[in-house]
Regions:
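C-terminal recognition in membrane/secretory proteostasis and scaffolding
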Residues: 22-23, 31-278
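Catalytic cores of extracellular degradative/oxidative enzymes
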Residues: 1-23, 28-29
Length: 278
């Protein structure tokens, strides 16, 4: 019934897994390289772990809240697309490890297709957990409680280690504006403002439209050069144009990358080979 909200805690699957399989599909088809595939996996993890909201908003909650926040300004948010892409990768590796390389997330999708779509019915989180449990002969309820319904940081070292990879982290300085925006209404419309961030200190509000930065077009602004600097924002708010000074913060961004463990065991190499098969 699309005349009303259809709240679901599973958009991290429906949308996020699509992101993951977009990357998997282009890699398996030979369009992208192994290095690009591994970089995408690491970047998804970095995209989540460098986001303040991940401490407070679970993938299930971000899925449900899309009905409140997609086109309505919200104070705080995180992408269930990226959350789901990251979790899909971790589930794929976990399933491969728990089945000694004989099954993967592909098999979960086949089961969802055959047991649900072809029979004209949807699926719940419990259905999905049941399918994974049946395939792996393991109980994945704890995984879901911690990482889907909860906000715990996944054990990346252990899970990427299933495929004989080490997750490397390297700090990088990046500008911290303290807001998220969308290009619309003739500028960048602020969709969320992080508590205690640079945007909040500048008295910016959700719904404000930034039209100029330092007198120039917002679409041509060199955002990457603003760390630690004071800039002047021209903002449209409630039909009025105002100017606000803003001191742009600087924060440490942890860049992630995957490197092969030269001491990988035969089991790890088997999982790796299956994961990277084209």
């Amino acid at each position: 019934d699309y005349t009303r909200e259809n709240e679901t805690p599973l958009l991290w699957v429906s949308e996020g897994f699509t992101n993951y399989y977009g990357i998997v599909g282009t890699y398996r088809g030979g369009v992208t390289s192994k290095e690009q595939f591994l970089s995408a996996a690491a970047n998804a993890a970095a995209g989540i772990e460098n986001t303040e909201a991940r401490k407070y908003i679970s993938p299930a909650d971000s899925s449900v809240s899309t009905w409140m926040g997609y086109d309505t300004p919200v104070a705080f948010g995180i992408s269930y697309y990226t959350q789901g892409q990251n979790l899909a990768c971790l589930l794929d590796l976990s399933i491969r490890n728990d089945t000694n390389g004989t099954a993967s997330l592909d098999d979960v999708f086949r089961a969802l297709y055959n047991d649900h779509y072809k029979k004209g019915r949807g699926f719940t989180t419990d259905d999905m957990i049941g399918i994974i449990n049946r395939i792996t002969k393991k109980d994945y309820r704890d995984f879901f409680n911690r990482y889907v319904f909860g906000v715990e940081v996944p054990d990346y070292d252990r899970i990427f280690g299933y495929a004989g990879y080490k997750l490397e982290k390297k700090p990088q300085a990046t500008p911290d504006f303290g807001f998220s925006v969308r290009p619309r209404n003739g500028g960048f419309t602020i969709n969320s403002v992080e508590p205690n961030g640079s945007a909040a200190a500048a008295k910016l509000q959700t719904g404000d439209v930034i039209t100029k930065i330092n007198g120039g077009s917002v679409f041509e602004a060199p955002f990457g050069t603003f760390a630690g600097k004071e800039i002047k924002l021209t903002v449209t708010r409630g039909g009025e144009e105002i100017e606000l000074p803003m001191k742009v913060g600087s924060r440490e961004f942890m860049a992630y990358s995957l490197s092969e463990d030269t001491a990988a065991t035969p089991q790890q190499i088997k999982v790796r080979d299956g994961w990277l098969k084209q």
